Amino acid sequence: MQERKAAVNRDTLETQISVALNLDGTGAAAFATGVPFLEHMMDQIARHGMIDLDVRCQGDTHIDDHHSVEDIGITIGQAMHQAVGDKRGIRRYGHAYVPLDEALSRVVIDFSGRPGLEMHIPFTQKRIGSFDTELFWEFFQGFVNHAGVTLHIDCLRGHNAHHQIETVFKAFGRALRMALEVDPRMGNAMPSTKGTL
């Protein structure tokens, strides 16, 4: 099977980003983004998705984190799209429930080629430390638009905002792992009756 790796650079007047990933990795991660809480969350994607993920960003964080967070989501989405290739042989769909103490989240993903995001997280705080929780929407919307996936995110319960979003990212990683897994029974077939995704 062809290696499922990608490296993408994205340069704008607001951010300069590089992302390298390996879908068949061991969960190794390295980050230098200037946004520490997002790095903590991306580490969950790598660890629970068994994806090697390296993300570097120089952004205008002296203004705020918005551009960096959104553009990192975009660039990871572009790299994911490139690494997946034509999607032959993958399971395509993935889902996971993940708890953390009182919090519980569900994430469902479809590598359909159709970008779509439904995200429902009733955050109990507007900020986690200095991080604005509204930016998680920007991260996932950027990812979805450029990975070409349908993504449903629901935090079902929780009263600690850190726990709420950590369960989301852990479930996201596990759903990715399931969807991207190669199904030996599929052979080289496309996981769609249309014959294309």
Swiss-Prot record:
It comes from the Bacteria. CDD domains: IGPD (cd07914). It catalyses: D-erythro-1-(imidazol-4-yl)glycerol 3-phosphate = 3-(imidazol-4-yl)-2-oxopropyl phosphate + H2O. Its EC number is 4.2.1.19. GO terms for cellular component: cytoplasm. GO terms for molecular function: imidazoleglycerol-phosphate dehydratase activity. HAMAP family: HisB. Belongs to the imidazoleglycerol-phosphate dehydratase family. This is Imidazoleglycerol-phosphate dehydratase. The lineage of its organism: Bacteria, Pseudomonadati, Pseudomonadota, Gammaproteobacteria, Cellvibrionales.
